[in-house]
UniProtKB/Swiss-Prot annotation:
Species assigned in the record: Drosophila melanogaster
Family, as annotated: Belongs to the HMG-CoA reductase family.
Protein name: 3-hydroxy-3-methylglutaryl-coenzyme A reductase
Lipid bilayer topology: Multi-pass membrane protein
Linker as annotated region, ranges: 385-498
Gene designation per UniProt: Hmgcr
Length: 920
């Protein structure tokens, strides 16, 4: 019941973050603006009236009271009570003689408290820093700052204390702030993938942490509050500060902190890649420990706390109520306001700004100690702690393993057998060495004892349950059941059993945990393929958002292959500067393209998208040639074409039929639909529209037989003259003029040499080879590199690499170079397919073309096509210059085989070039 209340409270704070934060700030502002003068005046008036009444009563009762109406000492309830309960309370009033209590013992005690608070706060922040998440560390720092602000406000206004007393009060707040709980809640919140999941995670965290924290707060308040009953003014002040620290920390943690977590996620989801933060949060030890089993309170400890709470409440009730009817209380109520007013009016104000500054800047002994501690901690963090401990551990792992091996006395044969048995256990032990140990050091003795330690920590490994029992758990909808309740070995046994319960190709959706599904699939494939153990270890699979891969990019996933991504640029295109991402494993490609960008950007590249249209060409058959000709004529009729276009356009918001080319081959028709597809590459969009158009044509010609939705007249992912002639995708043309000075300084050549090489190589040589669309040097290199980086279909480089590179001598003296690149079939898009993957999406963002254009659909895809064509021009120019200068082999040797020094000047022909990537 209590847990559900905290869960509801957490949902409210997380779903209404602005309201909670504004309400808390409003309350704080009200505390800051409270006018205590009215309260003081009322209290003074009451005290004066009461004193007058007492004086009148005293004079009327006889001479025993004195003519002045002074109350005798006997009426104050005895010396014992007076000494214990003074009428001046140090936390709310200015008391004479209070400064005298700042003796040597007090200075020593407060110095110890301050140093302890600083060290404890430093320890907590270092613990959070080791998690590797700057977001959690920043949120914890925000929590500390806001708590300090509210605590300071309460000290100054709510308790009426002096500003100078903050030097003692703030250290008590640092002592009670527990950043471990705030770190747990922050990581649990940041593990959510959307706002609704974050809200539920915060509510779940408060449900688990709230009851225990609330009980601890009550116990701490009652326990520390006993000090306020001591009658020792200095102790009462310190205990009151501590009590208020506990309360402020609890209020901020239960209200401001969950609202702040929810708000930070909501504001940062468009500007911060939260997947990195979520992966760090999911992989941390804190989040792994935040489970129901770990957070279940110890019943014995809970009972002890309840007993302590009851006893402490009894102490407080007795101490505060027992003397409520005594004479002391009457006198205290009578005299306290008057004495407080007199002291306040007669004492020298120590809270003036100048006095406070002088007092705080005075370097006493305790100030020197605190300063030394702070400086030492800062130096320690900067010079020693702010390093990644993993390299130190890796450097020590070799000597440690050797020392452990040397310390063994097991015979070699037995050791070999045990090594095979404990392969899996040793892997787990190595993992635990990096996650459990706080120190990065180890020795031989600790290494040899790790296996028993593992069994003590993890517990005995349970054998897999029967398959039928595992199936019942897998299909159960009860809480605590489902795939999460099964071990990896049990999932493997279910897959091996066959059936439709957990097929290997759908294991991610069955487990509802894609990364775990990929891990188990790797185990199964490794076993079925009889691979050596660890063969797939170098193929990464962790820390990847597979939800964006499933049903979009790849099936039967085993992991991912990292490809280096470089950039070429700056590239000045149509007045804008771009840094073009290129993913490749071919050395010198990015460097060569970058050199071309440097030459082109002197005067800039101009581009134009001449035509747009994705194609799909179904193949249909008719009973006779005459019937096929009749159908061709019917489709080409303008009125009938509009009917077909209406059916085609009804399948998509962006797909619009633009043209229809029909080729007849006997009784077969090849109908090539051409459509614009917005910012998508559009093959699936056109296929869907073509299918709907064929259905409409079939209504007019029932004897038409659909042979294939794609009849290779499109033509997709194959060299084809029709794409070279009629185009497919985006038809882009770029041009640029390179000055003679740029040719000499950047490319080390001249215009006439480049023009002659282009004529003989790209035109004559391509014609001799019968190349289709190959009138270029190496356009496919740049096209494929940009395609891989931006999430395009890599296989479409076959069609997209069609390029005609032309060069002419320019200007009056013919020393400048005029260059154009025409690419009639660039198939690119900025939405769909691989463009949604995190890395590829980042590269599109780098170019400013991620996703669909907000106002003009299709503009982002056009801009990407223009960038690709301009990048191809840069690569073409640089390679042509390298060819005429004999720099090609030299550059490839330098970038691909740096250990081989090639001296082309002294020995230009005696070089082995078989290891070069590609020489066009």
């Amino acid at each position: 019941m209590i847990g559900r209340l905290f869960r509801a409270h957490g949902e409210f704070c997380a779903s209404h973050p602005w309201e909670v934060i504004v309400a808390l700030l409003t309350i704080t502002a009200c505390m800051l603006t409270v006018d205590k003068n009215n309260t003081l005046d009322a209290s003074s008036g009451l005290g004066t009236a009461t004193a007058s009444a007492a004086a009148a009563g005293g004079s009327g009762s006889g001479a025993g009271s004195g003519a002045s109406g002074t109350i005798p000492p006997s009426s104050m309830g005895g010396s014992a009570t007076s000494s214990r309960h003074r009428p001046c309370h140090g936390w709310s009033q200015s008391c004479d003689g209070l400064e005298a209590e700042y003796n040597a013992a007090d200075v020593i005690l407060m110095t110890i408290v301050r140093c302890t608070a600083v060290l404890y706060c430093y320890y907590q922040f270092c613990s959070l820093h080791r998690l590797g998440s700057k977001y959690v560390l920043g949120i914890a720092g925000l929590f500390t700052v806001f708590s300090s602000f509210i605590f300071t406000t309460a000290i100054i206004k709510f308790l009426g204390s002096d500003i100078s007393e903050l030097k003692d009060a703030l250290f008590f707040l640092l002592l009670v702030i527990d950043l471990s709980n705030s770190g747990r809640l922050a990581q649990l919140a940041l593990s959510g993938s959307n706002q609704a999941e974050v809200t539920q995670n915060i509510a779940r965290g408060l449900e688990l942490l709230g009851p225990a924290i609330s009980l601890d707060t009550i116990v701490e308040v009652l326990l520390v509050g006993v000090g306020t009953l001591s009658g020792v003014q200095r102790l009462e002040v310190l205990c009151m500060f501590a009590v208020l620290s506990v309360l402020v920390n609890y209020v901020v943690f239960m209200t401001f902190y969950p609202a702040c977590l929810s708000l930070i996620f909501d504001l940062s989801r468009s500007g911060v890649d939260m997947s990195v933060v979520r992966e760090k949060a999911k992989g941390s030890l804190l989040l792994k420990s935040l489970t129901e089993e770990e957070q279940k309170a110890n019943p014995v400890l809970q009972r002890v706390k309840l007993i302590m709470t009851t006893g402490l409440m009894a102490v407080h009730i007795y101490s505060r109520v027992a003397f409520s009817g005594s004479d002391y209380d009457a006198v205290d109520k009578t005299l306290t306001p008057t004495l407080s007013l007199n002291v306040s009016n007669n004492r020298t104000e120590s809270g003036e700004i100048a006095d406070i500054i002088i007092k705080w800047l005075t370097m006493s002994a305790d100030h020197i100690v605190i300063s030394i501690v702070l400086i030492a901690l800062v130096v320690k963090f900067i010079c020693f702690d702010n390093r990644d401990p993993l390299p130190d551990q890796l450097r020590q792992s070799g000597p440690v393993a050797i020392a452990a091996k040397a310390s063994q006395t097991t015979p070699i044969d037995e050791e070999h057998v045990e090594q095979e048995k404990d392969t899996e256990n040793s892997a787990a032990v190595r993992t635990l060495l990096f996650t459990i140990e706080d120190q990065s050091s180890a020795n031989a003795s600790t290494q040899t004892d790790l296996l028993p330690l593992r069994h003590r920590l993890v517990g005995p490994i349970k054998p897999p349950r029967p398959v039928q029992e595992c199936l019942d758990i897998l299909n159960s909808t009860e809480e605590g059941s489902g795939p999460a309740a099964l071990s990896d070995e049990e999932i493997v046994s279910i897959v091996h059993a066959g059936g439709t319960h957990c097929p290997l190709h759908k294991i991610e959706s069955v487990l509802d945990d894609p990364e775990r599904g990929v891990r188990i699939r790797r185990q199964i494939i490794g076993s079925r393929a009889k691979m050596p153990v660890g063969r797939l270890d170098v193929l990464p699979y962790e820390h990847f958002d597979y939800r964006k891969v499933l049903n979009a990019c790849c099936e039967n996933v085993l992991g991912y292959v990292p490809i280096p991504v470089g950039y070429a640029g700056p590239l000045l295109l149509d007045g804008e500067t771009y840094y073009v991402p290129m993913a490749t494993t071919e050395g010198a490609l990015v460097a060569s393209t970058n050199r071309g960008c440097k030459a082109l950007s002197v005067r800039g590249v101009r581009s134009v998208v001449e035509d747009v249209g994705m194609t799909r060409a179904p193949c249909v058959r008719f009973p006779s040639v005459a019937r096929a000709a009749e159908a061709k004529s019917w489709i080409e009729n303008d009125e009938n074409y509009r009917v077909v276009k209406t059916e085609f356009d009804s399948t998509s918001r962006f797909g619009r039929l633009k043209d229809c080319h029909i080729a007849m081959d006997g009784p077969q028709l090849y109908i090539r639909f051409v459509a614009i597809t917005g910012d998508a590459m559009g093959m699936n969009m056109v296929s869907k529209g073509a299918e709907m158009a064929l259905r409409r044509i079939q209504l007019q010609f029932p004897d038409m037989q659909i042979i294939s939705l794609s009849g290779n007249f499109c033509c997709d992912k194959k060299p084809a003259a029709i794409n070279w002639i009629k185009g497919r995708g985006k038809r882009v043309v770029t041009e640029c003029t390179i000055s003679a000075a740029t040719l000499r300084s950047v490319l080390k050549t001249d215009a006439k040499t480049l023009v002659e090489c282009n004529k003989l190589k790209n035109m004559g040589g391509s014609a001799m080879a019968g190349s289709i669309g190959g009138n270029n040097a190496h356009a496919a290199n740049m096209v494929t590199a940009v395609f891989l980086a931006t999430g395009q279909d890599p296989a479409q480089n076959v069609t997209s690499s069609n390029c005609s590179t032309a060069m002419e001598c320019w200007a009056e003296n013919s020393e400048d170079l005029y260059m154009t690149c025409t690419m009639p079939s660039l198939e690119v898009g900025t939405v769909g397919g691989g463009t949604g993957l995190p890395g590829q999406s980042a590269c599109l963002e780098m170019l400013g073309v991620r996703g669909a254009h907000a106002t003009r659909p299709g503009d982002n895809a056009k801009k990407l096509a223009q960038i690709v064509c301009a990048t191809v021009m840069a690569g073409e120019l640089s390679l042509m210059a390298a060819l005429v200068n004999s720099d090609l082999v030299k550059s490839h040797m330098r970038h691909n085989r740096s250990s081989i020094a090639v001296n082309s000047a002294n020995n230009p022909l005696n070089v082995t070039v078989s290891s070069c990537s590609t020489i066009s």
